[in-house]
UniProtKB/Swiss-Prot annotation:
Cross-referenced CDD domains: catalase_peroxidase_2
Needed cofactors: heme b
Organism classification: Bacteria, Pseudomonadati, Pseudomonadota, Gammaproteobacteria, Enterobacterales
HAMAP family assigned to the protein according to its UniProt record, in alphabetical order: Catal_peroxid
Name by which UniProt lists this protein: Catalase-peroxidase
Cross-link Tryptophyl-tyrosyl-methioninium (Tyr-Met) (with W-105): residue positions: 226-252
């Protein structure tokens, strides 16, 4: 006979309690650690894009597959696709040119020069948040239109390359001559987690241009690619948009001329869509029902497509030939009187009040309309500086064509790194300053040359700390986002890097290495700087009782000052480098978060970061030669002392002041200060994930493993920009 308790005890009747319904019981559901501790250190950012998420496997070689591609056959198929209007998403004027240009633009336009993240180089428009970005409404249709072509050519063309190539072909098919195309963008298989899109919780939250100038954000509102086309915060005022336009395009590394060319060129073809109220538009792809199969924004207004399409809510056609390249954008901009009005969806735009009806309807050849412009288009006429450039382009269409071709190429290739990464038959021969060009190699050191150089470096009088510091300073500028920086080029010896505060100690070794380079004439300074690190690490390992060979691949070259854009390289100066215990500003995040940020830019895993920090500390590689984090009495010896002493419970740690940036480690019995540390040191004992790794390296049997792991991570950083070794 059952008791009253049995009535509520499903196990008493042999039923599994987890099959009885109620709350979500799926893996990953429920309250997470980030819900409980929202400020938890994002160590997970170092585990992105592993081979476990890659269906192609770690042996897949995209460059090799691309070499098998019928490139011009692909372009022919893309050209045909442009005019193959599909009933489920009819083409405006029978052409998808404007749609594909917007797709490419919005893929590339997420790039931010200040941190190198974003951009089109990884095909991120396939994933959230970008696949459901408010500014990307209807681009799900563009990507779906491309699927038959991607399906046909398979892995010979990445989605990332296909998106940009489709934009190029759209321009070419419209009568425009592009600057060229470089392939080489490899797909990833999950969203980037490291891109900081902002801290706003609501879409289209306004940001002030002054705030944009201080932050690595590329848009004036959360969910936009650039600026609100209705003006800042829907102001409807063209002049008020000028500062926002400069801030957002400037964050991409674009100057005023490039900005004007991109806006005008992008708005020479196609149209915006605002046939009816945006309240008719359904959820974005991420929120859409499963039966929508990855599409979103289904509209209930009329047919929902074609003449009834709603995208931005604006209903603008700029030129008389929206499927053919022209200079009509500038002609219309300056020829007519513009009056503010509203689209059928209620969005603010401008009509050419004194113009005849010269704009063709996208679906009814018998209809015409007046030219229309966005608020931000008129900024190019009414802002004094933009107006000068716009009038020059009005009077010199060829100058406009040249400027747009170059700016479009820059926009779509800005995050690809040096030109050596480009592949394909349409790579331009010209070197461009924003590509951080390098000269051709002039040295080819033999194995004996390298041995002789290592002896010269070892006998130079430079300490292990100096050797390691100069190599790290040179290589650690690399950014995995846009593939800029790194040791190749020896730009540590050039402006502006030579004058960075973080490099003050490191560059003191440069004259010695420059002398060795000149006297030997066997290798570039870039190679000798990296070789100095090799010598330092090998000496430190030997002092620890281990004979270690640090791999070294010669072939680096030395850049000239005229090949170095000082303003753009200033963006590579770190606000913090936890590997060297450096921090310039205290108003940007926490020291430990900035360490993760730096490690992620260097494409390091959590164990690699941990090994490098522990090794750099015992080698005395702090930027200012301080003792913070140097938990050893054997500086210059590659030991695991950092981890052993950090985890030693004989010491207790207390902050030295209210900032809690620096700490003293005191002996619990005597109260004597034994060590000092920064947050970038103590995080390896504080954070549970990093402590787990540190415990491995602190173990009594871990010394040799630690040294080998340090060397592997060190070589990885030294070679991050050696794309010729891939």
């Amino acid at each position: 006979m059952s008791t009253s308790d049995d009535i509520h005890n499903t196990t008493a009747t042999g039923k599994c309690p987890f099959h009885q319904g109620g709350h979500d019981q799926s893996a990953g559901a429920g309250t997470t650690t980030r819900d409980w501790w929202p400020n938890q250190l994002r160590v997970d950012l170092l585990n992105q894009h592993s081979n476990r998420s890659n269906p192609l496997g770690e042996d897949f070689d995209y460059r090799k597959e691309f070499s098998k591609l019928d490139y011009y056959g692909l372009k022919k198929d893309l050209k045909a696709l442009l005019t193959e209007s599909q009933p489920w998403w009819p083409a405006d004027w029978g052409s998808y040119a404007g749609l594909f240009i917007r797709m490419a633009w919005h893929g590339a336009g997420t790039y931010r020069s200040i941190d190198g993240r974003g951009g089109a180089g990884r095909g991120q428009q396939r994933f959230a948040p970008l696949n459901s970005w408010p500014d990307n409404v209807s681009l799900d249709k563009a990507r779906r239109l491309l699927w038959p072509i991607k399906q046909k050519y398979g892995q010979k063309i990445s989605w990332a390359d296909l998106f940009i190539l489709a934009g190029n072909v759209a321009l070419e098919n419209s009568g425009f001559r592009t600057f060229g195309f470089g392939a080489g963008r490899e797909d990833v298989w999950e969203p980037d987690l490291d891109v900081n899109w902002g801290d706003e919780k609501a879409w289209l939250t306004h940001r002030h241009p002054e705030a944009l100038a201080k932050a690595p954000l590329g848009a004036t509102e959360m969910g936009l690619i650039y600026v609100n086309p209705e003006g800042p915060d829907h102001s409807g005022e063209p002049l008020s948009a000028a500062a926002a336009i400069r801030a957002t395009f400037g964050n991409m590394g674009m100057n005023d001329e490039e900005t004007v060319a991109l806006i005008a060129g992008g708005h020479t073809l196609g149209k915006t869509h605002g046939a009816g109220p945006t309240s008719n538009v359904g959820p974005d792809p991420e929120a859409a029902p499963i039966e929508e199969q990855g599409l979103g924004w289904a509209s209930t207004y009329g047919s929902g497509v074609g003449a009834d399409a709603i995208t931005s809510g604006l209903e603008v056609v700029w030129t008389q030939t929206p499927t053919q390249w022209s200079n009509y954008f500038f002609e219309n901009l300056f020829k007519y009187e513009w009056v503010q009005t509203r689209s059928p969806a209620g969005a603010i735009q401008f009509d050419a009040v004194d113009a005849p009806e010269i704009i063709p309807d996208p679906f009814d050849p018998s209809k015409k309309r007046k030219p229309t412009m966005l608020v931000t288009d008129l900024t190019l006429r009414f802002d004094p500086e933009f107006e000068k450039i716009s009038r020059r382009f009005l009077n010199d269409p060829q100058a406009f064509n040249e400027a747009f071709a170059r700016a479009w190429f820059k926009l779509t290739h800005r995050d690809m790194g040096p030109k050596s990464r480009y592949i394909g038959p349409e790579v331009p021969k010209e070197d461009l300053i924003w590509q951080d060009p390098l000269p051709q190699p002039i040295y080819n050191p033999t194995e004996q040359d390298i041995i002789d150089l290592k002896f010269a470096i070892a006998d130079s009088g430079l300490s292990v700390s100096e050797l390691v510091s100069v190599a790290w300073a040179s290589a650690s500028t690399f950014r995995g986002g846009d593939k800029r920086g790194g040791a190749n080029g020896a730009r540590l010896a050039l402006m502006p890097q030579r004058d960075w505060d973080v490099n003050a100690a490191a560059v003191r070794a440069l004259p010695v290495l420059e002398k060795i380079q000149k006297e030997s004439g066997k290798a570039s300074l870039a190679d000798i700087i990296v070789l100095a690190g090799v010598v330092g690490v090998e000496k430190a390992a030997s002092a620890a009782g281990l004979s270690i060979h640090v791999p070294f691949a010669p072939g680096r070259v030395d850049a000239r000052q005229d090949q170095t854009d000082i303003e753009m390289f200033e963006l590579l100066e770190p606000i913090a480098d936890g590997f060297r215990n450096y921090r310039a500003r205290l108003d940007v995040s926490t020291t430990e978060s900035l360490l993760i940020d730096k490690a992620q830019q260097l494409t390091l895993t959590a164990p690699e970061m941990t090994a490098l920090v522990g090794g750099m500390r015992v080698l005395g590689a702090n930027f200012d030669s301080s003792k913070n984090g140097v938990f050893t009495d054997r500086v210059g010896v590659l030991s695991n002392d950092f981890f052993v002493n950090l985890l030693d419970m004989r010491y207790e740690w207390k902050a030295t002041d209210e900032s809690k940036e620096l700490f003293e480690g005191r002996d619990r019995e005597t109260g004597e200060v034994k060590y000092t540390a920064s947050r970038a040191d103590l995080v390896f004992g504080s954070n549970s994930v990093l402590r787990a790794v540190a415990e491995v390296y602190a173990s009594s049997d871990a010394h040799e493993k630690f040294v080998k792991d340090f060397v592997a991570a060190w070589v990885k950083v030294m070679n991050l920009d050696r794309f010729d070794l891939l």
